[in-house]
Design a protein with these regions (language model features):
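Preference for extracellular/luminal or secreted protein segments
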Residues: 1-171
Length: 171
């Protein structure tokens, strides 16, 4: 699985923010994205509040092409984008309906982009990666399963050092 994951050097800083998770649809993604999924739990453990987006839910989009994310609907704080979208070159027009490139540029301009993870779509990753500054935590995984989420997010989030627990028994 490690050969199908690409992770940059930058790390996500623990902070109060939004874990914005876009799934292609709720039913097919249910196995990869349950209430205990690493895509939800790891960012939440670092101060992010999870918001799930899917085609049947409320839209996060404004009518402004250069600032497409309606940030007032999301709340304050940095935004970690996790995009669970399958790559299909024959359905490219469907992905064009959601302006993720412009949303990333909007978040960069506002200094609110905490990081980007793309699961499943190499086409989307290839289009978004050139937009990201080298200081932006970013990763791609061909797989969407929970083990892929765990590996990607453990690489992106710094490991908290545990103080006071060495693991040794004392009396």
């Amino acid at each position: 699985m490690r050969h199908s994951i690409t992770v940059g050097e930058a790390k996500v800083l623990p902070q109060a923010g939004i874990n914005l998770v876009r799934v292609g649809s709720m039913v097919p993604s249910a196995a990869a994205l349950s209430g205990w999924s690493p895509a939800l739990r790891i960012p939440e453990a670092h101060g992010f509040r999870s918001l799930l987006l899917h085609g049947e839910g409320l839209s996060p989009w404004s009518d402004q092409p250069k600032t497409p994310l309606a940030l007032d609907r999301l709340g304050d704080g940095a935004v970690l984008l996790q995009l669970f979208l399958r790559g299909n070159p024959f359905r490219a027009g469907l992905n064009a309906q959601e302006p993720w490139a412009a949303a990333i540029q909007q978040l960069i301009a506002l200094n609110r982009l905490a990081g980007v993870v793309v699961y499943g779509s190499p086409y989307l990753w290839d289009s978004l990666k050139p937009l990201l500054p080298s200081s932006c935590p970013a990763a791609y995984s061909a797989g969407q399963m929970q083990e892929a989420q765990r590996q990607v997010l453990n690489a992106l989030f710094p490991t908290a050092t545990q103080t006071g627990h060495s693991g040794a028994f004392t009396d």
